[in-house]
């Protein structure tokens, strides 16, 4: 099986993860398509006007999310990082079950202020949350080089995808935890904002999305290859 970096693959993230050897990735991003908050709010017009684009995307069960996290744990190097996007609902209810039986530790969190309000019965959602996970052993020296990143980050984005993410924040996190030409992994890439962040920082993107993407994963004879 051969896979190339800096390609927007249209594929199941599990298929891509199974191609990656153990302990090879320094930094990954994971933005699961969960529906916990939608089930909680239970809007009657879900899938019509409100959030139609989001509702049309394939939803991940909790078991699927746990499966992704365990595979990401397997491929991450010791003291490597995984950046996990969550909303307020999952932040409050906790992600302990997601990282159970892995070597991931919660070491930090960044609040992304999107600059516009979303849904909510009481307070309106304006933020998303990026949980910073580090694989054991936990350490900052030599693993995190940018100490100027604030824990509340304001960045407006042009919405090209229901889950558009802040490229400038991702760029700072990528450069803080990797070196030029290192591989950055995103197995549920959505609008491929991590791809853009990698290209702009001189890193190699390895990722896919089940719906979006330009190229299918192809089986070929040969060893796993990660090349631009």
Enumerate the language-model features and the residues they cover:
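Glycine-rich helix-loop-beta junction characteristic of Rossmann-like nucleotide cofactor-binding loops
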Residues: 19-21, 74-75, 173-179
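Short active-site oxyanion
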Residues: 5-7, 78-82, 183
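Conserved phosphate-coordination/catalytic loops
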Residues: 8-11, 55-66, 160-168
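Glycine/Thr-rich phosphate-binding loops of Rossmann-like dinucleotide-binding domains
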Residues: 17, 38, 92
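SAM-dependent nucleic-acid methyltransferase catalytic core
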Residues: 1-35, 180, 200
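Class I S-adenosyl-L-methionine
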Residues: 30, 34, 38-49, 84, ...
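Conserved Class I SAM-dependent methyltransferase catalytic core
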Residues: 58-115
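SAM-dependent methyltransferase catalytic-core segment centered on the flexible catalytic loop
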Residues: 21-81
């Amino acid at each position: 099986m051969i896979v190339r970096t800096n390609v927007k693959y249209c594929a199941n993230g599990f298929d891509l993860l199974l191609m990656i050897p153990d302990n090879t990735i320094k930094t990954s991003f994971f933005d699961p398509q969960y529906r916990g908050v939608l089930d909680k709010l239970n809007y009657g017009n879900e899938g019509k006007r409100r959030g139609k684009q989001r509702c049309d995307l394939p939803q991940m069960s909790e078991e699927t999310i746990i499966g992704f996290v365990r595979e990401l744990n397997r491929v991450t190097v010791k003291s490597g990082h995984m950046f996990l996007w969550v909303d307020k609902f999952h932040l409050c209810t906790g992600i302990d079950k997601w990282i159970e039986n892995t070597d991931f530790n919660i070491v930090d969190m960044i609040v992304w202020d999107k600059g516009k309000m979303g849904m909510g019965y009481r307070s309106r959602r304006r933020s998303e949350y990026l949980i910073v996970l580090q694989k054991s052993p936990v350490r900052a020296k030599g693993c995190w080089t940018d100490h100027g990143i604030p824990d509340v980050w304001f960045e407006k984005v042009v919405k090209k995808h229901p889950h558009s993410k802040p490229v400038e924040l991702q760029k700072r996190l990528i450069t803080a935890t990797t070196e030029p030409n290192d591989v950055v992994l995103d197995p549920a890439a959505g609008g491929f904002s991590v791809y853009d962040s990698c290209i702009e920082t001189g890193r190699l993107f390895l990722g896919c999305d089940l719906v979006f993407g330009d190229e299918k994963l192809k089986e070929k004879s040969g060893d796993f290859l990660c090349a631009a």
